[in-house]
Amino acid sequence: MTRCDDSPSASQISITHVTQGSCVASSSPNEVYATILGSCICTCMCDPVAGVGGMNHFLLPSADVEDAQHLRYGSHAMELLINALLKLGAARQRIEAKIFGGAMMTPQLGAIGQANAAFARRYLKDEGIRCTAHSLGGNRARRIRFWPKTGRVQQMFLGSEDVVPNEQPQFRLQGGAGDVTFFDRHNNAEMPDPIKEPR
């Protein structure tokens, strides 16, 4: 059978799992980034003209959004991602972002998920980066897949029986175009798009 398009086959797709503290970027049409989020935030950024995109995954050390020392961790994660895109040929004024996560998963972490979400939205606003979509908060973990070449994102909410990585605040710094599709693992049906356009 002859393929009539340039879409990569399943055997060509490379899935990179992005863990807490990581930042990745690519221009490959064969690359897919995947992560699981509880209280953490992941930012998916893309320059749709250059066809480059990337993802970070971070958790602030505390829920205190006024603590400049703690906010450094989130700012560092964002700056790493932006710089990685610029090195691949992105133009800063064209970069678009989608943000996910910030759930309230355990009493031990308190309102840290909410603080992470607030930080991400404020950072994008302050830096003049357009947030085209977000899915934040709640009390369920999310599985995210991101196609950096096109900016497409797929989200699935996980159930209580699913294994979610143990998220812990970190105290050391570590070095969009497209559509968003939502699935519910309990019925495997595409859900109405609950992403809200930020105000």
UniProtKB/Swiss-Prot annotation:
Name this polypeptide is given: Probable chemoreceptor glutamine deamidase CheD
Catalytic activities: L-glutaminyl-[protein] + H2O = L-glutamyl-[protein] + NH4(+)
Annotated function: Probably deamidates glutamine residues to glutamate on methyl-accepting chemotaxis receptors (MCPs), playing an important role in chemotaxis.
UniProt GO MF annotations: protein-glutamine glutaminase activity
SUPFAM superfamilies on file: CNF1/YfiH-like putative cysteine hydrolases
PANTHER family on file: CHEMORECEPTOR GLUTAMINE DEAMIDASE CHED-RELATED
EC top class named in words: hydrolase
Source organism of the structure: Cereibacter sphaeroides (strain ATCC 17023 / DSM 158 / JCM 6121 / CCUG 31486 / LMG 2827 / NBRC 12203 / NCIMB 8253 / ATH 2.4.1.)
Pfam families (UniProt xref): CheD
Organism domain of life: Bacteria
Taxonomic path: Bacteria, Pseudomonadati, Pseudomonadota, Alphaproteobacteria, Rhodobacterales
InterPro entries listed in its UniProt record: CheD-like_sf, Chemorcpt_Glu_NH3ase_CheD, Cytotoxic_necrot_fac-like_cat
Enzyme Commission number, as recorded: 3.5.1.44
The family this protein is said to belong to: Belongs to the CheD family.
Keywords: Chemotaxis, Hydrolase
GO biological process: chemotaxis
